[in-house]
Amino acid sequence: MKEMVDYGIIGFLIFLSVIVIAIAIERLWFFATLRVDDYTDRRKLELALHKRLTLVATIGSNAPYIGLLGTVMGIMLTFMDLGSASGIDTKAIMTNLALALKATGMGLLVAIPAIVIYNLLVRKSEILVTKWDIFHHPVDTQSHEIYSKA
């Protein structure tokens, strides 16, 4: 049972980290090949830019909880083993508790880069939308100078 919890939680967190990496690579490739002047509607551009970013944010915000779930389950199994054993083996208890805590560490190891990646991708999206605005609504320098003198 302990191995199932351990491998299940850690395996799921590794799977989530692979998803985040795949989305990051796909988005960076999309951003690199994007031409903002190909879009005539800002809303369509924003939809294209924000594709799959919600999934990255969801993984980043929930990975610590998944790791915590693994820790809680590991601690519960340790207490069950402790309750069913006739003697107290301090070494086994400490080893099991340490192994249970690695799930929380793994959750944080997935969450922190996922949130950083999400923030970088959102910022890049904002920059591209601003470039679209500049391309489609250039500032008339003469009228801008007239209004700034008034």
UniProtKB/Swiss-Prot annotation:
One of its GO terms (cellular component) is plasma membrane. GO terms for biological process: protein import; transmembrane transport. Signal peptide: none annotated. The chain crosses the membrane at residues 5-25, 63-83, 97-117. Keywords: Cell inner membrane, Cell membrane, Membrane, Protein transport, Transmembrane, Transmembrane helix, Transport. It is found in: Cell inner membrane. Its main location: membrane. It is a multi-pass membrane protein. Belongs to the ExbB/TolQ family. This is Putative biopolymer transport protein ExbB-like 2. It comes from Helicobacter pylori (strain ATCC 700392 / 26695) (Campylobacter pylori).
